[in-house]
Amino acid sequence: MTEAQLTLPTTKLSPTQKTQFIKLEKKLRRNVGQAIAQYNMIEDGDKVMVCLSGGKDSYAMLSILMLLKESAPIHFDIIAVNLDQKQPGFPEHILPEYLDKLGIEYHIVEEDTYGIVKEKVPEGKTTCSLCSRLRRAVLYKAAKKIGATKIALGHHRDDMIETLMLNMFYGGKMKAMPAKLVSDNGEHVVIRPLAFCKESELIQYSELKHFPIIPCNLCGSQPNMQRQNIKRMLNDWHDQFPGRIESMFTAMQNVVPSHLCDSNLFDFKSINSTSGIINGGDTAFDEVAIEAPQDLSMKNQPNADQLLNVVEVK
């Protein structure tokens, strides 16, 4: 399959939509390529298991990774994996038909986690937490079976910011979603290639590509209200204060432990009058110089010249 076949949507676009699509896809490719390079997500010879749920994010992740594979200076394999959790009404034909058209290797893993969740969680309660744990266990098992070296999940920038706010407001921790981590069982490396991608752009991309979306509410579970509240708050901030969300994500990549309060991250006890000024000293009450948040780009990245081969859109 050629890059042009991978790129163009299956339905006809107007000239304006086509221009919009090309610009958007180029930006998503650049952002995914930058995340891969910055966190060393994919290496030569990797077998990447792309977890495909049937939602907009995982479809977009698969699409962009397939494009990058065509132009990357390294070789890596992609295997799409979907977990059929036996939810009532799940359209089992959609993903196989879509993946057959792409001509990509894939596996449909059938595991009745839905039945377990319904048995364990009282009616009307949110099932997402238990469902997520069961799903991870099945996917880790699948990754081991197919020999995957990386597991790719479709969480994006907005998911990461929401998780940070959730943990701050409800968990008392400054903790978000890492772009790269070791799996719960200690056997796999999990990556989030969409870490630098905005949800709004993924929605737009999905609409232009006309992905065959499978709804995520087939289980009948109520949404996580805390996360929904955080999402609404962030959306309001985005509307009222343009650039605030971008600034928040930049802050997540620019942490100054000496100016927080965690003694595990910084040795406050050893500070004395001979320690010198640390990271600017006490500027808590000085007026902060506000700079317009910059969109993710290569110009402020260290070793930018080394990343271009991975990120370059050909």
Swiss-Prot record:
Coiled-coil intervals: none
Major site of localization recorded for this protein: cytoplasm
Residue window of motif PP-loop motif: 53-58
InterPro entries, sorted: Rossmann-like_a/b/a_fold (IPR014729), TilS/TtcA_N (IPR011063), tRNA_Cyd_32_2_STrfase (IPR012089), tRNA_thiolation_TtcA_Ctu1 (IPR035107)
Entry keywords, A to Z: 4Fe-4S, ATP-binding, Cytoplasm, Iron, Iron-sulfur, Magnesium, Metal-binding, Nucleotide-binding, RNA-binding, Transferase, tRNA processing, tRNA-binding
Reported cofactor(s): Mg(2+); [4Fe-4S] cluster
Pathway: tRNA modification
Broadest EC class assigned to this enzyme: transferase
Entry GO CC: cytoplasm
Molecular function GO labels: 4 iron, 4 sulfur cluster binding; ATP binding; magnesium ion binding; sulfurtransferase activity; tRNA binding
Residues bound to [4Fe-4S] cluster: 128, 131, 219
One Pfam family recorded for the sequence: ATP_bind_3
The keyword Cell inner membrane appears for this protein: no
Cellular compartments annotated: Cytoplasm
Gene3D superfamilies: HUPs (3.40.50.620)
Miscellaneous: The thiolation reaction likely consists of two steps: a first activation step by ATP to form an adenylated intermediate of the target base of tRNA, and a second nucleophilic substitution step of the sulfur (S) atom supplied by the hydrosulfide attached to the Fe-S cluster.
Quaternary structure annotation from Swiss-Prot or TrEMBL: Homodimer.
Family membership: Belongs to the TtcA family.
Its job: Catalyzes the ATP-dependent 2-thiolation of cytidine in position 32 of tRNA, to form 2-thiocytidine (s(2)C32). The sulfur atoms are provided by the cysteine/cysteine desulfurase (IscS) system.
Stated name of the protein: tRNA-cytidine(32) 2-sulfurtransferase
Species of provenance: Colwellia psychrerythraea (strain 34H / ATCC BAA-681) (Vibrio psychroerythus)
